């Protein structure tokens, strides 16, 4: 029979017959199902006006509206559909065209549709629609089916018309996360399901009675059969066509029977039709639209079902059409048979209505893996329905099946997990039923009672979470219902594999499909990915889960302070969301990723389990309510993938690297803690430094099991250690199981509050957490007391020592708790957990490269390390500690204020830093974490230093260091610093951005960045670090290159530093620089003291590249040179100094090659500079003058002794000393080991600082590296340069600096630094030092300013640095903050005074390292000096060429200069030294000649002396030339040189002549550098002014 019917023809060509009744259009249980998420579940209604025989569409107030002819129709208003009207629902890709046409409806189909023949023939579609509505609701569902059959018959017509349409048919927008392949075979079904599933849903809803159930049976079964039948009948297979087929014969029966069939399994036709279709559709009255399809077909084999389906279709279908229809129908039937469509259907329906995740949950149910947590729908959602319906049983079956699978996968893990899970899970199992209900409630009724939600959420979160997975395992075992509700979690958490819940007849195909879907949605994580990952993680994570019980409590507590995290965790808590999100987020995030709280719980559980037992119960219970609420939210949030791919990746990395609780606790902890801890960052960093160590120890569980060192090492080598940790944690799990049980209850109490992310609650909980954290830390001390208590107490004592301990002690408690709760977050490096904004850097396992050598965190963690550091600090401890205590008090006050501020900010936007950090850390987690680890390690160590410096000092340093270095960057840096100081957490992102920006612009700003590097080292490691990153990365070749790999690491460092807190910042900057470089090589065996010393002496390359001392010497030099020149090298050709130093490079392997390895060293140098700058600024700020000399002496002694012996003592001492002043407390205070671990890079830097001083000269050249580009320019633009005084002066300045570098290096090598430094080397050293430290900044500027800026920068840097090195006095520092590079004249004189000590110290240090340093340095210095001489000869020749047209008596000048400058070679035991001295003297002469050539009458010098300050300010390079020279000379040359001379003379009184010569060179260099500034077209001169 043919019916004239209205059709909606989708853009895909699918015809949907519009039944003559009202049909719903939407995503859920609608007659017309659209998959687009822009379509509401009930989006619109298409009604039929029988009188007018027209259809009207009414938008049901949908979010995205309904569009007729692209005009949005008013809501709740019927709009008549006319022919060819284009109908669009929401933004669904299907554009439906209203078509009226004949639809041939087979009698069977009409009968099947419950169309009586009269309806079929007389009423046709209208009657069918009427009967549909008129029919009993069973009939209604059938009629809906019929009505849909008509639209779908229309579709079927289309299908008939285009049997290919079903497959070709637009399947609707795939569900989010749905692969395009979904429904290829299923699409027909999906269509059928779309037609029959959703309409069924409606029908079911409408005929909530068995009719709908039957309809669903019929629909599900008939979907294929009916499709075939309908295809003949022009019905799309997407209609209830399997039933049609079945019912075409049975349909006739079904007409009558179908009304009966709506009973569970009216066998009329679908029983016969599709054995698999035999299922009971149970409507959950409590959940309208939720139909539980009990698959009786599970009893049927897929083949049986398939055969039944096909049999009924074959039997019923028209042979001709049936054959045509059979392909799609068979497709559908096959799919249905294979995929247990009944299960799919009920799953679909339940999930559809229930599924928050899926646009078209029904489709998801259809989807093969839809039963499992698809990205779109989670089993939890299904579980919600099934919990109400049979879904629970099915889920239990699936859970059993999946868990059996997972068990197999995770059994080893499960064993541990089950231990924890049985305890915790049984514990939670007690809550299992409520949890299942709660899961439903959470999914459906977020406002479910908090107690249940708490339990359920704890469970749900736990189930979803890692621990809950265990719980789920047990719960599922214990409670099938609970398992159903938690099945999603279990499926999600199936990783445990502990679930014995198995489907009666788990359909392997269905499982396969589910797995595919799960895989698509990341749910597969549950089964395969998550489980295996989790299994690895679970080894530790299971313990973590056991701990998670405790950790959940902690986590809940933490999420309290981290509302966002709660949401995340909530989303994670949502079983499906967590699950599939977890895979999407990352396999690693499986356990750690989604439930930040959970992660926190897990990690926290590890650490906190002990503490949480006592503490968590208190705080967590208070947080319990919020947690529950949050969990509900999470439940809902599960709808969407909670973890971004980045986070997933991060988490995945984290899970992989810190597969267990580090990432779990860390990430969750990190996010939470970051919010909390950012407030506490400095304090907490202090506390967290210890706590981090403790946390790591706890996380590594080594503290629990062994020592902090082990724990940290475990965290550091998380995979290997965590395995042991897993076992350790197994016992811990056992230990914590009781705690977990307690804590689980606590968690239940606490979970809700934790998830209740109100800021008040956060603050309140923070307090509670602090208290509980304190308790926890105490508990940790008690429980983990083996090492943890030692580490904690040591940490706490250390914190007390630091005075930061006071707040950090609270925060150490907090930090303990937090860090306990947050085992280190393997952000960036191991776990690519998205560095939560809440994650304080402490939480991030900042495994220094030196963590390998002396895991800073470990060092800090270990009481011995802490005490070593204290001892080393004690060396400077009396001063450092006093200063630190004072500073710490100031910092504490500041931090307290800031904590309050940050608590607000953290609550508000702690994510920003986290994400900024994520920006740096997440993507580059390995590098970043390496950086972060080094940073944190450095931070931890630096924290003490920085804590010693008051945060204010640090802040000042930050500001001051930034400001001198860059005007722009200075402003940006300073602003950033201030912002960071103000809102460290909030600004961490900005800092990272600023850092990135600085990196972008920092190359011009880099000098300031370099200073910022100092600043970074200082209190402003955020900005400083970003600056360091940019300046190190960009400015310091070594830094740049060393850091460039670490850029992310640097960013991470920055983030870490930013978050790491102030104290950590001081340390971290240097360590971050060096450590970052080492971080880059993070997975490095822990350096031995020997390695550290060797590296310190020879540079990091010594371990790998530098086998011989010469190489080592070269390495240290080159590292600095390389770092200095490297960025130019990277950007430009090797700078002059690099060229000069090239032999060394060659020795090193290649200076450029060295750059990378030196990048570490140079970065270390940069870091050292940073640290030095910081220490300079910080020490100065912190009356580091007294401290600095002592610190310098101590640190230099230590450094010299341990690491920078030769370099440090020689030229290294002054530069190192200044640097040490920068890191005075850090370096002086920390012991050699700490020095190695903390300042391993810094030491290297210091070493490199001496070689780096040489290299610094090289850096001058390195900064001259831009100069080398400039050199090329000079070569290229020789004429231009000839015309350009700037170029000449640059050349001259470069040469002078080369000479200075060579002289300084020679002096250093010769050990005559004292004498030479006094006269010649002092400027040289100054130049070298300046080049090394400020020079980094100068390098940046130089790069910018090319030769002009270069020389100026180099000279400025040299002078400033020498001044800085010498004048670390706070007074100088205060000025230095304004101009770190261009230290004011005042700052120079002061350093000049201090350099006496420095020089002396350097001399003493040198005596220790003299032999090695001599040997190593001499050859390299010799080569370097030769290169410098050659370079200067070339330069002199070039200058001659440049000035050949000037009327100058070059020969006279040269002769005069030679005669004057002929200083008798200092008699030394080393021919190399003599040669070096000769070379340097030649260079000196050449430089003097050049100086004479350039400024034969001394006009420039006079101008420089007179107008140098002004000269800096003038932007015209040439005008600058004169003024700059004036400025430079008086400022730098006169003021600087004499002080330096004075400073150096006491130490270097021996070689006054050489020193004089070098001083002259330095003076000329100063002039040149000033000229350089003048010539600096980039306005670096202004920077110089600022600096100066």
Curated annotation (Swiss-Prot):
It comes from the Eukaryota. Residues 844-1588 are annotated as: Targeting to microtubules. InterPro entries: Cent_Immune-Sig_Mod (IPR051176), CEP170_C (IPR029300), FHA_dom (IPR000253), SMAD_FHA_dom_sf (IPR008984). The modification Phosphotyrosine is found at residue 363. Residues 23-73 form the FHA domain. Pfam families: CEP170_C, FHA. Residues 155-164, 347-357, 407-418, 645-654, 663-691, 720-731, 764-774, 789-821, 899-908, 967-980, 1049-1062 have a biased composition (Basic and acidic residues). The modification Phosphoserine is found at residues 141, 355, 358, 443, 463, 494, 568, 577, 628, 631, 662, 718, 829, 870, 872, 922, 925, 950, 1008, 1048, 1102, 1104, 1122-1123, 1135, 1150, 1155, 1188, 1195, 1200, 1229, 1231, 1241, 1260, 1270, 1362, 1521-1522. It is found in: Cytoplasm, Cytoskeleton, Microtubule organizing center, Centrosome; Cytoplasm, Cytoskeleton, Microtubule organizing center, Centrosome, Centriole; Cytoplasm, Cytoskeleton, Spindle. CDD domains: FHA_Cep170A. Its main location: cytoplasm. Residues 121-172, 299-323, 338-447, 461-508, 602-854, 899-1222, 1228-1247, 1315-1334, 1370-1398, 1511-1540 are annotated as: Disordered. Residues 1103-1588 are annotated as: Targeting to centrosomes. The keyword Coiled coil applies. Keywords: Coiled coil, Cytoplasm, Cytoskeleton, Microtubule, Phosphoprotein. The modification Phosphothreonine is found at residues 498, 639, 752, 906, 912, 1012, 1047. Residues 1075-1093, 1112-1128, 1158-1173 have a biased composition (Low complexity). Phosphorylated; probably by PLK1. GO terms for cellular component: centriolar subdistal appendage; centriole; centrosome; ciliary basal body; cytosol; microtubule; spindle. Residues 620-631, 822-839, 913-937, 1028-1038, 1191-1218, 1518-1534 have a biased composition (Polar residues). Residues 1467-1495 form a coiled coil. Belongs to the CEP170 family. Interacts with CCDC68 and CCDC120; leading to recruitment to centrosomes. Interacts with PLK1. Interacts with NIN. Interacts with FHDC1. Interacts with CCDC61. Interacts with TBK1; efficient complex formation may be dependent on the presence of CCDC61. Plays a role in microtubule organization. Required for centriole subdistal appendage assembly. This is Centrosomal protein of 170 kDa. It comes from Mus musculus. The gene is Cep170.
């Amino acid at each position: 029979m043919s019916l004239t019917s209205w059709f909606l023809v989708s853009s895909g060509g699918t015809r949907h017959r519009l039944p003559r009744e009202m049909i719903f259009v939407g995503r859920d249980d609608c007659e017309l199902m659209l998959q687009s998420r822009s379509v509401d579940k009930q989006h619109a209604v298409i009604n039929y006006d029988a009188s007018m025989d027209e259809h009207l569409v009414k938008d049901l107030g949908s979010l995205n509206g309904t569009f007729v002819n692209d005009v949005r129709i008013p809501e709740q208003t019927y709009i008549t559909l006319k022919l060819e009207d284009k109908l669009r629902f929401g933004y669904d890709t299907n554009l439906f065209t209203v078509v009226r046409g004949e639809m041939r409806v087979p009698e069977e189909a009409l009968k099947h549709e419950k169309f009586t023949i009269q309806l079929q023939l007389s009423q046709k579609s209208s009657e069918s629609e009427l009967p549909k509505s008129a029919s009993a609701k069973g009939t209604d569902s059938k009629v809906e089916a019929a009505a849909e059959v008509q639209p779908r018959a229309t579709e079927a017509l289309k299908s008939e018309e285009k049997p290919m349409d079903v497959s070709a048919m637009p399947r609707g927008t795939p569900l989010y996360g749905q692969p395009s392949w979904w429904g290829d075979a299923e699409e027909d079904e999906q269509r059928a399901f779309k037609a029959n599933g959703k309409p069924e849903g409606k029908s079911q809803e409408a005929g909530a009675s068995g009719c709908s159930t039957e309809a669903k049976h019929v629909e599900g079964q008939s979907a294929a059969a009916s499709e075939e039948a309908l295809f003949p009948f022009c019905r799309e297979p997407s209609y209830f066509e399997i039933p049609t087929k079945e019912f075409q014969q049975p349909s006739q029966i079904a007409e009558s029977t179908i009304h009966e069939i709506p009973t569970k399994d009216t066998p009329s036709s679908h029983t016969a039709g599709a054995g698999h279709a035999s299922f009971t559709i149970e409507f959950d009255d409590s959940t309208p639209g939720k139909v539980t399809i009990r698959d009786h077909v599970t009893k049927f084999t897929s083949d049986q079902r398939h055969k039944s389906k096909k049999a009924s279709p074959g039997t019923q279908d028209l042979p001709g059409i049936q054959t045509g229809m059979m392909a799609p129908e068979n497709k559908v039937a096959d799919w249905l048979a294979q995929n247990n469509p009944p299960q799919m259907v009920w799953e679909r329906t339940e999930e559809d209505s229930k599924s928050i995740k899926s646009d078209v949950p029904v489709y998801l149910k259809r989807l093969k893996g839809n039963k499992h947590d698809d990205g779109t729908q989670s089993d939890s959602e299904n579980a919600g329905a099934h919990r109400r319906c049979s879904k629970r049983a099915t889920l239990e079956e699936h859970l059993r099946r999946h868990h059996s699978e997972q068990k197999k996968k995770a059994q080893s893990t499960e064993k541990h997990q089950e231990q924890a899970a049985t305890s915790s899970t049984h514990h939670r199992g007690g809550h299992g039923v409520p949890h299942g209900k709660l899961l439903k409630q959470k999914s459906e009724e977020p406002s479910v009672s908090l107690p249940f939600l708490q339990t359920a959420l704890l469970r749900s979160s736990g189930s979803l979470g890692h621990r809950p997975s265990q719980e789920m395992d047990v719960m599922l075992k214990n409670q099938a219902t609970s398992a159903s509700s938690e099945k999603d979690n279990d499926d999600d958490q199936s990783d445990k594999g502990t679930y014995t819940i198995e489907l009666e007849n788990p359909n392997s195909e269905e499982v396969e499909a589910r797995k595919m879907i799960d895989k698509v949605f990341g749910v597969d994580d549950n089964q395969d990915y998550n489980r295996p990952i989790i299994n690895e993680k679970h080894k530790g994570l299971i313990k973590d889960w056991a701990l998670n019980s405790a950790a959940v409590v902690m986590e809940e507590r933490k999420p309290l302070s981290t509302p966002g995290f709660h949401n995340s965790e909530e989303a994670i808590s949502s079983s499906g969301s967590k699950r599939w999100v977890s895979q999407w987020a990352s396999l690693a995030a499986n356990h750690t990723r989604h439930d930040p709280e959970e992660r926190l719980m897990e990690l926290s559980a590890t650490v906190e389990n002990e503490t949480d037992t006592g503490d968590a119960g208190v705080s967590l219970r208070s947080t319990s309510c919020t947690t529950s609420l949050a969990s509900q939210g999470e439940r809902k949030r599960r709808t969407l993938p909670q973890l971004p791919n980045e986070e997933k990746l991060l988490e995945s990395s984290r899970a992989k690297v810190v597969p267990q609780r580090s990432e779990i606790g860390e990430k969750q902890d990190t996010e939470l803690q970051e919010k909390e801890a950012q407030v506490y960052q400095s304090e907490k960093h202090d506390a967290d430094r210890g706590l981090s160590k403790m946390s790591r120890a706890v996380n590594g569980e080594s503290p629990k099991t062994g020592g902090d060192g082990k724990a940290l090492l475990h965290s550091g080598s998380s995979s290997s250690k965590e395995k042991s940790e897993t076992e350790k944690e197994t016992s811990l799990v056992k230990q914590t199981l009781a705690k977990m049980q307690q804590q689980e209850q606590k968690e239940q109490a606490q979970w809700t509050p934790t998830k209740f992310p109100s800021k008040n609650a956060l603050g309140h909980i923070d307090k509670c957490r602090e208290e509980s954290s304190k308790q926890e830390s105490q508990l940790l001390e008690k429980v983990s007391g083996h090492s943890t208590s030692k580490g904690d107490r040591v940490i706490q004592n250390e914190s007390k020592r630091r005075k930061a301990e006071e707040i950090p002690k609270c925060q150490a408690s907090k930090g303990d708790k937090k860090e306990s709760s947050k085992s280190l977050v393997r952000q960036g490096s191991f776990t690519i957990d998205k560095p939560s904004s809440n994650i304080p850097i402490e939480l991030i396992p900042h495994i220094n490269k030196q963590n390998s050598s002396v895991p800073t965190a470990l060092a800090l963690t270990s009481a011995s390390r802490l005490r070593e550091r204290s001892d080393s600090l004690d060396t400077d401890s009396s001063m450092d500690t006093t200063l630190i205590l004072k500073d710490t008090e100031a910092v504490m006050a500041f931090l307290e204020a800031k904590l309050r501020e940050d608590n607000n900010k953290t609550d508000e936007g702690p994510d920003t830093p986290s994400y900024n950090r994520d920006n740096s850390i997440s993507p580059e987690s390995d590098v970043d974490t390496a950086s972060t680890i080094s940073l944190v390690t450095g931070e931890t160590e630096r924290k003490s230093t920085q804590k010693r410096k008051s945060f204010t000092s640090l802040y000042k340093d930050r500001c001051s260091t930034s400001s001198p270095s860059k005007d722009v960057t200075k402003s940006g840096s300073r602003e950033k610093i201030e912002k960071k100081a103000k809102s460290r957490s909030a600004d961490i992102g900005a800092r990272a951005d600023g850092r990135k920006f600085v990196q972008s612009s920092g190359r011009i700003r880099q000098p300031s960045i370099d200073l910022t590097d100092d600043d970074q080292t200082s209190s402003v490691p955020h900005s400083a670090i970003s600056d360091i990153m940019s300046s190190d990365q960009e400015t310091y070749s070594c830094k740049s290159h060393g850091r460039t790999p670490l850029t992310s690491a640097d960013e991470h460092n920055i983030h870490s530093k930013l978050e790491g807190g102030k104290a950590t910042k001081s340390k971290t900057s240097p360590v971050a620089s060096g450590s970052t470089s080492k971080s880059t090589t993070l997975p490095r065996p822990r350096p031995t003291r020997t390695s550290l010393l060797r590296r310190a002496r020879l540079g990091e390359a010594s371990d790998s590249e530098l086998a011989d001392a010469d190489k080592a010497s070269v390495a240290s030099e080159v590292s600095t040179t390389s770092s200095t020149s490297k960025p130019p090298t990277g950007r430009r050709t090797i700078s002059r100094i690099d060229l000069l130093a090239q032999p060394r490079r060659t020795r090193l392997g290649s200076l450029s090659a060295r750059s990378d390895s030196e990048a570490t060293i140079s970065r270390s140098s940069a870091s050292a500079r940073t640290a030095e700058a910081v220490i300079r600024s910080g020490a100065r700020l912190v009356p580091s003058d007294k401290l600095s000399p002592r610190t310098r002496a101590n640190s230099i002694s230590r450094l010299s002794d341990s690491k920078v012996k030769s370099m440090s003592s020689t030229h290294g001492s002054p530069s190192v000393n200044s640097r040490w002043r920068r890191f005075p407390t850090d370096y002086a205070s920390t012991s050699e080991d700490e020095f190695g671990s903390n300042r391993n890079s810094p030491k290297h830097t210091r070493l490199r600082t001496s070689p780096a001083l040489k290299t610094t000269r090289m850096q001058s050249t390195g900064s001259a590296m831009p100069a080398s580009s400039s050199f090329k320019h000079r070569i290229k633009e020789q004429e231009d340069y000839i015309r350009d005084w700037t170029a000449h002066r640059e050349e001259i300045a470069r040469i002078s600096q080369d000479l200075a570098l060579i002289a300084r290096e020679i002096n250093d090598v010769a050990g005559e630094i004292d004498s030479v430094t006094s006269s010649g080397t002092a400027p040289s050293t100054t130049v070298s030092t300046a080049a090394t430290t400020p020079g980094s900044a100068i390098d940046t500027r130089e790069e910018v300013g090319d030769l002009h800026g270069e020389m100026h920068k180099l000279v400025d840097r040299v002078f400033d640095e020498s001044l800085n090195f010498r004048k670390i006095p706070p007074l100088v520092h205060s000025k230095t903050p304004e101009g770190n590079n261009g230290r004011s004249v005042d700052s120079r004189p002061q350093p000049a005074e201090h350099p006496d000590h420095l020089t002396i110290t350097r001399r003493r240090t040198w005596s220790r390292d003299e032999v090695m340093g001599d040997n190593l340095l001499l050859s390299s210095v010799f080569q370097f000096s030769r290169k410098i001489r050659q370079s200067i000869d070339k330069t002199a020749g070039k200058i001659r060429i440049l000035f050949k047209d000037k009327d100058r008596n070059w020969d006279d000048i040269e002769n005069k200069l030679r005669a004057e400058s002929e200083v008798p070679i200092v008699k030394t035991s080393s021919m190399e030294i003599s040669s070096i001295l000769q070379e340097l003297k030649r260079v000196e002469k050449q430089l003097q000649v050049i100086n004479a050539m350039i400024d034969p009458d001394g006009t420039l010098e006079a101008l420089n002396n007179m107008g140098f300050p002004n000269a800096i300010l003038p932007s015209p390079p040439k005008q600058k030339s004169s003024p700059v020279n004036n400025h430079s000379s008086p400022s730098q040359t006169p003021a600087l040189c004499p002080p330096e001379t004075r400073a150096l003379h006491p130490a270097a009184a021996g070689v006054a002549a050489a020193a004089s010569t070098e001083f002259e060179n330095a003076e000329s260099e100063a002039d040149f550098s000033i000229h350089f500034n003048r010539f600096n077209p980039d306005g670096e001169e202004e920077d110089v002014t600022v600096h100066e």
